[in-house]
Every structure is written in structure tokens, then in C-alpha cells.
Swiss-Prot record:
Record protein name field: Phosphopantetheine adenylyltransferase
Coiled coil: none
CC cofactor: Mg(2+)
Subunit structure, interactors included: Homohexamer.
Protein family according to the UniProt entry: Belongs to the bacterial CoaD family.
Pathway stated in the Swiss-Prot or TrEMBL entry: Cofactor biosynthesis; coenzyme A biosynthesis; CoA from (R)-pantothenate: step 4/5
A Pfam family per the record: CTP_transf_like
MF terms (GO), sorted A to Z: ATP binding; pantetheine-phosphate adenylyltransferase activity
Function: Reversibly transfers an adenylyl group from ATP to 4'-phosphopantetheine, yielding dephospho-CoA (dPCoA) and pyrophosphate.
Keyword ATP-binding: yes
Organism: Bifidobacterium longum (strain NCC 2705)
PANTHER family reported in the protein's UniProt record: PHOSPHOPANTETHEINE ADENYLYLTRANSFERASE (PTHR21342:SF1)
CDD domains: PPAT (cd02163)
InterPro entries: Cyt_trans-like, PPAT, Rossmann-like_a/b/a_fold
């Protein structure tokens, strides 16, 4: 059985993330989507919320061989714990490769875990969590960029953010 891990901050999960996860689920017996907690980042959504939203989106997509969880440790440690031999990362044309290559080499050196890069769907490659939040902050419509359940959550989170600033 081949087990893969798709790590990310998923703040929020986007249509591009889901595309990579769904495509990965076709190639591997088991895929673990891992919300990686990064102490250097201040997320908009809680760890539990991000896990829940991804689960709901993947249930709707019918992905039966995908597990969603989180970790605040090294992804390689998580991989060892679940027996994963591959880390999956989606790549856009915006410099993702350069950013991800160094991490892939470290992961292979630390734990012998390979990284498989999947190119983003050209229709989705412009979408990132940062862009989604920026568009929403400025009143733009993010429908289609994120799962349907994220749209109202994003509006609520931004309303709370504005109230804190006032």
C-alpha cells in the first residue's frame, strides 16, 4: 500500500488545493491531507476549522481514501508515523518550484521521503490562499476559487477582522 501526504497551511483551502488532493487520491492507496501549523504565520482560520472545511469539501467530492488531520511537528515525522513514503506538492508558475525544491531535498535527507510535484491545473494556477483573502478583503467575489462552504466563513472572518480594527 502506498501512502502519500499533502501538507499545507490551507488558510483557506482553495480550488487549486482540492484539485491537487483529488488528483493525488487517484494515484495513491491512501492520502493524508495535513494542515501544517506554522508558528511563523498567523492564520485567519483555526487549525480545527481548516481541518473541518477540508473534510467537508472532500466528502462532497467523494474522496474515500483521503484522511485529514493536522500537525505542529515536522512533516517527515508525520510521514513516518503513518507510513507515508511520498509528499505531494502542487506547483504553480509563480516560483513554487524554487520554494519547494529546498524543502524536498531536506525531507529526503532527513527521512528518505520523496516529494512528488504535481503541476497546477492551468485554470486554477493563479489561485492562492493569499489572493483569495486579498480579493475578499477588498469586496471581490471568491466564488469558484474556494469550496462553497468557505465563502460565508471568509466573509464572517473578515467582518470580525474589521471590527477588531475599529
Amino acid at each position: 500500500m502506498t501512502i502519500a501526504v499533502c501538507p499545507g497551511s490551507y488558510d483557506p483551502v482553495t480550488a487549486g488545493h482540492l484539485d491537487v488532493i483529488e488528483r493525488s487520491a487517484r494515484f495513491f492507496d491512501e492520502v493524508h491531507v495535513v494542515v501544517a501549523v506554522n508558528a511563523a504565520k498567523t492564520p485567519m482560520f483555526s487549525e480545527a476549522t481548516r481541518v473541518d472545511v477540508i473534510r467537508r469539501a472532500l466528502d462532497k467530492a467523494g474522496c474515500k481514501n483521503v484522511t485529514v488531520s493536522s500537525t505542529d511537528g515536522l512533516i517527515t515525522d508525520y510521514c513516518k508515523k503513518v507510513g507515508a513514503t511520498v509528499i505531494i506538492k502542487g506547483l504553480r508558475q509563480n516560483g513554487d518550484y524554487e520554494a519547494e525544491l529546498g524543502m524536498a531535498l531536506v525531507n529526503r535527507k532527513l527521512a528518505g521521503i520523496e516529494t512528488l510535484f504535481l503541476p497546477a491545473d492551468p485554470i486554477l494556477e493563479h489561485i492562492s490562499s493569499s489572493i483569495v483573502k486579498d480579493v475578499a478583503r477588498h469586496g471581490g467575489d471568491v466564488t469558484g476559487m474556494v469550496p462553497d462552504c468557505v465563502v460565508p466563513m471568509l466573509a464572517d472572518a473578515l467582518a470580525e477582522e474589521r471590527q477588531r480594527k475599529d
